[in-house]
Amino acid sequence: MSHRVLVIGSGGREHAICWKLSQSPKVAQIYALPGSHGIQLVEKCRNLDAKTLDPKDFEAIAKWSKENQIALVVVGPEDPLALGLGDVLQSAGIPCFGPGKQGAQIEADKKWAKDFMLRHGIPTARYESFTDTEKAKAFIRSAPYPALVVKAAGLAAGKGVVVAANAKEACQAVDEILGDLKYGQAGATLVVEELLEGEEVSVLAFTDGKSVRAMLPAQDHKRLGNGDTGPNTGGMGAYCPCPLISQPALELVQKAVLERAVQGLIKERINYQGVLYAGLMLTRDGPRVLEFNCRFGDPETQVILPLLESDLFDVMEACCSGKLDKIPLQWRNGVSAVGVILASAGYPETSTKGCIISGLPAANTPTQLVFHSGLAVNAQKEALTNGGRVLIAIALDGSLKEAAAKATKLAGSISFSGSGAQYRTDIAQKAFKIASASTPGLSYKDSGVDIDAGDALVQRIKPLSRGTQRPGVIGGLGGFGGLFRLKELTYKEPVIAEATQGVGAKIHLALTHEFYENVGYDLFALAANDVLEVGAEPVAFLDYIACGKLQVPLAAQLVKGMADGCRDARCALVGGETAEMPSLYAPGQHDMAGYCVGIVEHSRILPRFDLYQPGDLLIGLPSSGLHCAGFNEILTQLAASKVNLRERSPVDGGDDGLTLAHVLATPTQLYVQQLLPHLQKGDEIKSVAHVTHGLLNDILRLLPDGFETTLDFGAVPVPKIFGWLAGKLKLSAQTILERHNCGIGMVLILPQSSQLWRTSLPGAKVLGVLQRRSKVSGSPVQVRNFVEQLEKVASPFGGLGDRELPEELKKLPSNSDLSAPREECFENAAGRRLTRIPTHYKDPILILGTDGVGTKLKIAQQTNRNTSVGIDLVAMCVNDILCNGAEPISFSSYYACGHWQEQLAKGVHSGVQEGARQANSSFIDSHSAALPLLYEPQVYDLAGFALGIAEHTGILPLLAEIQPGDVLIGLPSSGVHSNGFSLVHAVLKRVGLGLHDKAPFSDKTLGEELLVPTKIYVKALSTLLSRGKHGIKALAHITGGGLSENIPRVLRKDLAVRLDANKFQLPPVFAWLAAAGNISSTELQRTYNCGLGMVLVVAPTEVEDVLKELRYPQRAAVVGEVVARKDPKKSQVVVQNFEASLARTQKMLSQRRKRVAVLISGTGSNLQALIDATRDSAQGIHADVVLVISNKPGVLGLQRATQAGIPSLVISHKDFASREVYDAELTRNLKAARVDLICLAGFMRVLSAPFVREWRGRLVNIHPSLLPKYPGLHVQKQALEAGEKESGCTVHFVDEGVDTGAIIVQAAVPILPDDDEDSLTQRIHKAEHWAFPRALAMLVNGTALISPEVSSQ
């Protein structure tokens, strides 16, 4: 529905309001009373002169509005509001954007306004009001605060305020304003205020009288001259948004100023709708209100409204109808507007009229605006000065500094004849001077993450890793994964077993009491003991360490403990990951996870339930203490009971001077040396259970259906530490059985006749005997004599109680739809997943990788969008092992949290499983634990472990073969991926943006953008890597350390690379981060992927073959080359044109997003490609598909539009008399939707010449051939019949001919020997889905242009 609007006023503010309202498709006509020359030039606008309507005759305005069906009256200046225009209009039933006379008092009567603030607790300066000059001056001289601000209580056109330098000046102002009535009756009452110190900021807000919504903060410049010198004016310039007010301060203004004011008006029964303007001083004690205004500010309006994305008519209508809380209020992010006022000579005391103005731009543009404040036109159509403030020159840019420079330059290009113009050249300077002085550029180290410390740790633990090497290990630490060669072992039919473990809250004990090596040993022992359960030999181990602040000596001791365990088990420590996450972990906090890979002969896999016989023995091997079970609750309860763990132990070890902490921290017993030789013989041990979930629970895992047993502790003493624990915490015997190992760390099933437990397993005890199950009900495990044994050791410490302990380890069900394994994966008799080596590998190399998601998790937790981080986890791990040429085979994860929330954990877990599916990997298992001592209630951490296999001859990188001249091919990233998020958090904090705020670089929220999952490159690369000769010499996953640190991992020291940033897209998120955080280009390249998620090093002769596989589906491109490194001191990575690319992207963000219409006639597959591309911010297409038009009803393309939430129209050509009439209707609808660009995507209509001319340079088509060959229809048939070797597609400008317009992009597709029309068409479609978005990007960023007069480039 189209509406008519009346705007009252004639200045720059009203010009800006009319300009913004004209952009609303709901507004058909705007009348301005009395208006101005500039307003008259705005589309849809028309001036009303005083002869038609007297601006001071309110009744006549109301009557005219009724007669002319005015839907809304917008009052610009304060005077009509103060005189009651709003009341007259409301009485006549005409919606008025602006308050009535009572509401306008908030500006019109400064005494009333100050009293109002006092009544409602709104923070403001101290004050007194006077009608007597002598009393006012006496107060100034005696006030207990600097009473130096003198204000006329009434309206004085923004000039009735004097900020005096001293009491003498203030008294002089009293004499002028009150004594001489310089501003007439406006100064008959005087307000004398305290002089506040700080920066002034304007916060304007929309209100409907019930709710109030703040606009972006702005800063006005009141003084006439540079450096805030000279007299006060109505305002000499402004900029928006103003960075001087922080987000917390803005939130305080919302609550303590705006909301209190609206509530105060409600309490005083004053109806108020329109703008509530708060002029603020940012003092050391917080924001204080200097004044309220009842209307838009001038010149703030002129820099605020260009940043408003919402429809201004909708907002104003909502204010007048009490529905402001029902509409979204959206602003352009990442853009600043700066306006410089040009005033006539003599202003503010007088104004020089009639001076000729020259240099005015011909028209406003999206980045440059001029609004008229006091400008007239003579008979010769020359622009003349016609007031004090004549016009405002405005520039918009992604950089505040650039916007200020451009606005000042624009002002300087405009001149007034005669005495010339007055304008300031320092508008906004204060903001960026303060910003640059107080906010130096952020770095990753500033955000709490020290890459150098991580590198130092790697160097420190390399010798520890080397000390664990064994037959099979290839390479060392510092690459992308750990490598192990199976051929060096003696297995005939090897099967892979995997185990993931954590040490729980025992790490809290270790950190508190500095038992770092002990807990590192624990971690390895738990994982290695787990693989023994299937009869496997532990051969390789990875660790994951997470912390708030990396302390290299501490982390090195943790790893030393792991390395000691590895040596004891003859298992190799092949790699690990250290994650420094200051926003997830407090300084000093740590957690760890471990992953062990074992190998077992297929015929030796345990358990062998099929061999069980009644009479078989349950043999228990002694534990070394509590191991790692239940420490979260143990430590919590002991602390609550005020037990001092530094006291000498009253149980084991106390006689040797050990403290309780020493005893509790005793490392987990490692059983590899004891058991592995007997497991590999395979003749006696039928089953193994590692006791980690409590003795009772783990014995249950040994019993298949049909068997039971009775555990008898008559001859099995319980270690004293369990008695002490039960006595101190008043635990029940059942809880000790269910939550702790009771002195038994491993349980075996042996034949009744076996003597193994007597001869070869020191300390082994018979716990029970297997029996056939006699009854279905009841537990298959009964226990005798345990209570008695436990009571013996508990009685010295108070005896047993009835307290229970919660389960710390959690089990999550797998989603069968997502967790379907590869065919090599199978389950043993106990349901544990194992993996056969795929038969096509002749010399298989196991490749292991681990990683986490970093503080990206914090964003998931804060936005409650937790599913996608599981995909990130898989991506980070599998992308790493791809770099060694691996085929990902399996994946395991670790999940630890503060408070167990099952639905949350399931959501995270489903994401991990989805990632494993995308990576074509079997999901093996997740170790999950609730650890309140380590994590806050809503916090969790994730670690992942990937296993892949490569043929020995296919291992990457081929370091010796990489040479200068080799080509770099880049695969684009999907955004930030999962590294550098600590720096992201620091930037968000600096700029005061929240995760639910709209992203400054897209239409999504920041949370949505930052949580886009890391791209998994398995599908992209697996086909290539599976070929014997693929031409790829190296792959570099651009992960933590960015471009600068990851590409060198696949280079010799004598080589470097030269990248060209013009050849790959820098995702806008990085341009925004750089600007918002003042991050240097070097730091950006050292922290982030900058748009390249994976870099391939390819022999020059193989480039085309590689690109044939990757260009269209993956948007791969040549991005650089390998060069000789001439200076060993210089970086191995040089990125040319990076600054230019960065500036180009930042400039793009400062511009309005282009609005695109797509015209279709059918399925709309290219429409879908355009929608997907424009909604993927990483592709950097600064545009949105806003309208879809089809000439046919019911086609699939319309469904695609509906599913994407894009408005669509069916405009059938059959309903129109001629092609020209039909096309005119298209144009009408396109203009109503404010469309900038049109894409023809299978639109089966020949467009008329007038339509083509109307949209020339903004109208493009995609054609399924390599033009100029085969224009028109049936092009695939023509190409096949002609025996062509290749075909493809062309995106071109549309002109009056048939497919003759200038070409923008072409994409070639080979024609294969067995191709028919259908197969060739399908392959061309894939090329089209690459080419069309690429062409649109060129069109949007201005690299594809065509002259309006010609049809070829």
UniProtKB/Swiss-Prot annotation:
It comes from the Eukaryota. It catalyses: 5-phospho-beta-D-ribosylamine + glycine + ATP = N(1)-(5-phospho-beta-D-ribosyl)glycinamide + ADP + phosphate + H(+); 2-formamido-N(1)-(5-O-phospho-beta-D-ribosyl)acetamidine + ATP = 5-amino-1-(5-phospho-beta-D-ribosyl)imidazole + ADP + phosphate + H(+); N(1)-(5-phospho-beta-D-ribosyl)glycinamide + (6R)-10-formyltetrahydrofolate = N(2)-formyl-N(1)-(5-phospho-beta-D-ribosyl)glycinamide + (6S)-5,6,7,8-tetrahydrofolate + H(+). (6R)-10-formyltetrahydrofolate binds at residues 1219, 1244-1247, 1261, 1295-1299. Binds 1 magnesium or manganese ion per subunit. The record marks 1299 as: Raises pKa of active site His. Residues 1153-1353 are annotated as: GART domain. Mg(2+) binds at residues 291, 293. Residues 114-321 form the ATP-grasp domain. Transmembrane segments: none annotated. GO terms for cellular component: cytosol. ATP binds at residues 193-196, 200, 223, 232. The active site is at 1263 (proton donor). Its cofactor is Mg(2+); Mn(2+). Pfam families: AIRS, AIRS_C, Formyl_trans_N, GARS_A, GARS_C, GARS_N. Its EC number is 6.3.4.13, 6.3.3.1, 2.1.2.2. Residues 441-1155 are annotated as: AIRS domain. The N-terminal ATP-grasp domain carries the phosphoribosylamine--glycine ligase activity. In the N-terminal section; belongs to the GARS family. This is Trifunctional purine biosynthetic protein adenosine-3. It comes from Drosophila melanogaster (Fruit fly).
